[in-house]
Amino acid sequence: MILVIDTSSPSSSVIATIDDDRMAETFSTGRGLDLEQLRHLARTEQITKVAVASGPGSFTGLRAGVSFGLGLAMGLRVPIVPLPTLDLQAARSDEPVTAVADAGRGRFYFLVPGGTVALGEPSGIPTAYPLVGRVANKGAPLVGAGHRFKPETELRRFVEAAAKILETAREVPYGSLEIEYMQTFSASRK
């Protein structure tokens, strides 16, 4: 079983499991991980790989998720795989979308199709594509700036997006896992 942990959002976290015949996901609101659920999974399931959202995202959130995931992978001697947060969001759609993540202070990290990660105010994010992402306040500043979110009913589940990304994602040595924090990420400003 592959365990996927995403704590990149300052307002929620996701724990997903991918097995040969089943996929499951659990969302938690607020900061932090559901440590009881993670401990239960570690005790009762044969974890063969751990994947963690690597940002950009919340400093505290990313550290918690990546630290737990890395410690678990090392303890179980299984591979660790970083999954860029915005790639995970973009993979939820078959159609081109702009992936977004909170960057704090009214700004957002975003990734347009074929582009690189950038940082900007809502008015600086291109409106050519619908948005996908877990953001605070239901994305009110983005909607107020003329953006539209792709409806959840038209998106694949987080766990399905993670499975899609994992098809080509590369495992990294334990000491080489890099986290891309809010405001320290090398995004270009738009």
Protein language model regions, located:
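Alpha-helical context
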Residues: 26-28, 48, 62-66, 158, ...
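Oxyanion-binding and handling regions
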Residues: 1-21, 30-32, 36, 81-190
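Short glycine-rich phosphate-binding loop at a beta-alpha junction
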Residues: 46-55, 129-137
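DPxDG-like acidic metal-binding loop motif
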Residues: 49-79
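A short glycine/serine-rich beta->alpha loop
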Residues: 25-28, 54-59, 149
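Helix-rich "cap/lid" substructures immediately adjacent to catalytic or cofactor-binding pockets
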Residues: 24-49
